[in-house]
Amino acid sequence: MTPPLPGFRDVRVVVAGDLMLDRYWHGATQRISPEAPVPVVRVDGAEERPGGAANVALNVAALGGEAQVVGPTGSDEAADRLAELLEAAGVGQRFHRIAGADTITKLRVISRHQQLIRLDFERGFPGFDHAAMLALLEPALADAAVLVLSDYAKGALPDPAGLIEAARRAGRPVLVDPKGADYRRYRGASLLTPNLAEFEAVVGPCADGDEIAKRARQLAADLELEALLVTRGEAGMTLAPREGVAVHLPTRAREVFDVTGAGDTVIATLAAALGAGVDLADASALANVAAGVVVGKLGTATVTPAELEAALGGGPAPAAGSGVVDEPGLLAAVRQARAAGERIVMTNGCFDLLHAGHVDYLQRARRRGERLVVAVNDDASVARLKGAERPVTPLAQRMAVLAALDTVDWVVPFSEDTPARLIEAVLPDRLVKGGDYQPEQIAGHDVVVAAGGSVEVLPLLAGASTTDLIARIRSRG
């Protein structure tokens, strides 16, 4: 039986480890290069997300907890961008910036939802040692409920055992996502969360779940751990406490699109649940459900409480249309969506007398990301742009009809002649406009592009316009 969803609101989690910036280039692949037998990708979109230890913290924040990251970075543009992304998601940062070092960056090229290649940018962190990490960590532990060590063997955790000892002295449980074959580095931790390949690299091949549990319990005893949670892909997970009965949790995934970052979601959900007072068995069951949700998403992603509640069967799946919002409500919703790794698409218009052309356009706009914001001119703004006889339909009715479309997430009004100020506040990943404009002519173009987003013009459905519709109505008396 899966436990009910706890409240994560006041749970504070510190995540120490290898901080990364994940970058994605998206595009179509239709031919092979004449220069070499490789596909040519025409890039038409790019996005950035926190990765590694930063993605663990992002997952905690997406669940509603308070998260802070601790670790080394370069003193470079990637570190600045990572800080901006974390700040936007409400995640605190304690970076140790090192001049001349690279912030760990992974660039993935994606076409048709398939990863074609990954390029890694990293050179290590010269001079960063245990004392430096401990100095970063100790102040953060003061008001934390749980410490997570996210180890990708990139140099952020030169002595994890020393950090574990410091956390245990402070009375904080320590969860570790381990790396490498020497788990003695993690002696005294509360819990390790290796995947099956990592686990078997330490203990040897295991024939079945029972053997996994047996060897995990022995390893827990040898290393003075409370338990191990071994993630096993399509076979689910095995929780093996040092004392007590092992539990095998079958997978909850319905579809698997991408396992990138799934381990981050598991340990983040465990940390948030344990910090909320859930026992280890129930916290592991929740983490298993969260993993089943996140592998159904593309790229490094997160899980929201609504998604977790729906997966638990305790509530409806999050609705695509979240209704009419004011600007503060929109910005709060966008922050939550970004914390969940969702791309924000934004468009705007009068949308007077909604017709098939509008519906077709909004459907195509929504396919550019996971969330669609529609900014709507208020009545006075429409009158200034279209003339005193417009709008035909008042603002409240126009917004209500738009919000009823399953392609639209949020509808927000604006009173200016252009939504430039609102666009700057939202900073969508992709700004979309219908018509025959040049992208540079679209309000908000410069700020969106400067923030790393893109601007796209979509052609409108021929023969469908509000002006023509009004003319036809008038011609029929």
Curated annotation (Swiss-Prot):
The question of whether Iron is a record keyword is answered with: no
Catalysed reaction(s) here are: D-glycero-beta-D-manno-heptose 7-phosphate + ATP = D-glycero-beta-D-manno-heptose 1,7-bisphosphate + ADP + H(+); D-glycero-beta-D-manno-heptose 1-phosphate + ATP + H(+) = ADP-D-glycero-beta-D-manno-heptose + diphosphate
Its keywords, alphabetically, are: ATP-binding, Carbohydrate metabolism, Kinase, Multifunctional enzyme, Nucleotide-binding, Nucleotidyltransferase, Transferase
- Show the active-site residues: 264
Annotated ATP binding lies at 195-198
What Enzyme Commission number(s) appear in the record? 2.7.1.167, 2.7.7.70
Task: List, alphabetically, the PROSITE patterns matched.
Answer: PFKB_KINASES_1 (PS00583)
Domain of life assignment: Bacteria
An annotated Gene Ontology molecular function: heptose-1-phosphate adenylyltransferase activity
What does the record list as GO biological process? ADP-L-glycero-beta-D-manno-heptose biosynthetic process
| First-level EC class | transferase
Q: Which CDD domains match?
A: RfaE_like
Q: Does the keyword ATP-binding apply?
A: yes
List the Pfam families.
Answer: CTP_transf_like, PfkB
Annotated region Ribokinase: where? 1-319
Q: Name one GO cellular component term.
A: cytosol
Q: In which pathway does it act?
A: Nucleotide-sugar biosynthesis; ADP-L-glycero-beta-D-manno-heptose biosynthesis; ADP-L-glycero-beta-D-manno-heptose from D-glycero-beta-D-manno-heptose 7-phosphate: step 1/4; Nucleotide-sugar biosynthesis; ADP-L-glycero-beta-D-manno-heptose biosynthesis; ADP-L-glycero-beta-D-manno-heptose from D-glycero-beta-D-manno-heptose 7-phosphate: step 3/4
Region span, Cytidylyltransferase: 346-477
UniProt lists the family membership as follows: In the N-terminal section; belongs to the carbohydrate kinase PfkB family.
Instruction: Describe the subunit structure.
Output: Homodimer.
Summarize the protein's role: Catalyzes the ADP transfer from ATP to D-glycero-beta-D-manno-heptose 1-phosphate, yielding ADP-D-glycero-beta-D-manno-heptose.
- Name it: Bifunctional protein HldE
Q: Can you name the source organism?
A: Halorhodospira halophila (strain DSM 244 / SL1) (Ectothiorhodospira halophila (strain DSM 244 / SL1))
Q: What is the lineage of its organism?
A: Bacteria, Pseudomonadati, Pseudomonadota, Gammaproteobacteria, Chromatiales
